[in-house]
């Protein structure tokens, strides 16, 4: 009986509120995108992380490429990406990503990856090669990289910095108190150090991070996380609603659904605190409409 009541409560809390409703996406465009990725042997975080915006983004011909395979060396409790023994590094992958960027004629592209603790540089070199290949084929395309923490290895961070992406993103994900439970193989302070070190290595690169709400955090904890990110030199912040990828024991359950009004409050607060750009809403994800954040940062430094 207790188990049945728990399952019922879980079902109720995971019943999506009305503000999650979206327009039906362009099915033909989505199929074209899927065919392109399959033929190029490429992965997208859109699919692997089961992003709720996939239909909208793919319908507009936009996607976030995920390099270094689709199996992560870590098993964060919020993430839908497969965890286990990572795949072999594909030396042709950077070129295939660049070809896809060219075929889609992207003005702005986001490159992310699984964590690769099994590699000496934890995947930094593959990021660099991917940036270089895109620069060769699409020199005007702006590039954002969404990186794992590379265990805060300075040499790995330096490699990526020297490749000159326009934006470097690393997600802190949640408040300090919840971090050990939500992402046990990561570390809250290490994530802050990664962002801070990127700024030290190249102050001209915009840095970015993301926070999920609905994991049991308090308003005070969200505001403290904002303060911590600002102290680390973070320019861009995205805030979205956590949605459990599955009902399995691996994944944390949703504790609460945050209203659009609360998201609006956090956006206003973040801008007042000093972030150059804040995108905050139930469906916001770290790579969602990423170009907008980059453009706003550019405008603000020109003022």
Model-derived segments and their meaning:
Residues 1-64, 95, 99, 105, ...:
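Auxiliary Fe-S-binding modules of radical SAM enzymes
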Residues 45-57, 68-83:
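Local cysteine-cluster metal-coordination motifs and their immediate loop/turn environment
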Residues 67-68, 145, 170, 280:
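Small/polar loops that bind or transfer phosphate-bearing groups
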Residues 75, 119, 178, 247, ...:
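Glycine/Thr-rich phosphate-binding loops of Rossmann-like dinucleotide-binding domains
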Residues 80-96, 103-154, 160-194, 208, ...:
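Core AdoMet radical
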């Amino acid at each position: 009986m207790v188990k049945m009541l728990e399952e019922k409560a879980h079902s109720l809390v995971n019943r999506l509120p009305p503000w999650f409703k979206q327009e039906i996406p362009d099915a033909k465009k989505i199929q074209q995108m899927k065919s392109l990725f399959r033929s190029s042997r490429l992965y997208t975080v859109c699919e692997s992380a089961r992003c709720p915006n996939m239909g909208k983004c793919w319908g507009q011909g936009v996607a976030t490429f995920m390099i270094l395979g689709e199996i992560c060396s870590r098993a964060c409790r919020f993430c839908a990406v497969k965890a286990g023994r990572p795949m072999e590094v594909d030396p042709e992958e950077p070129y295939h990503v660049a070809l896809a960027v060219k075929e889609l004629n992207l003005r702005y592209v986001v490159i992310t990856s699984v964590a690769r603790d099994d590699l000496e540089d934890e995947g930094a070199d593959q990021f660099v090669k991917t940036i270089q290949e895109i620069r060769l084929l699409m020199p005007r395309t702006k590039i954002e990289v969404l990186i794992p923490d590379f265990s805060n290895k300075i040499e790995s961070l330096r490699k990526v910095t020297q490749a000159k992406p326009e934006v470097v993103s690393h997600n802190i994900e949640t408040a300090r108190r919840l971090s050990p439970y939500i992402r046990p193989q990561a570390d809250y302070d290490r994530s802050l150090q990664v962002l801070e070190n990127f700024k030290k290595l190249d102050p001209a690169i915009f840095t970015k991070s993301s926070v999920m709400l609905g994991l049991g955090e308090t308003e005070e904890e969200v505001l403290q996380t904002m303060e911590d990110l600002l102290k680390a030199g973070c320019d861009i912040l995205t805030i979205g609603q956590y949605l459990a990828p599955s009902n399995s024991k691996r994944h944390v359950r949703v504790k609460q659904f945050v209203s659009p009004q609360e998201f609006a409050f956090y956006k206003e607060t973040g801008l007042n605190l000093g972030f150059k750009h804040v995108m905050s809403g139930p469906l916001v994800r770290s790579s969602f409409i990423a170009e907008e954040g980059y453009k706003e940062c550019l405008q603000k430094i020109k003022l």
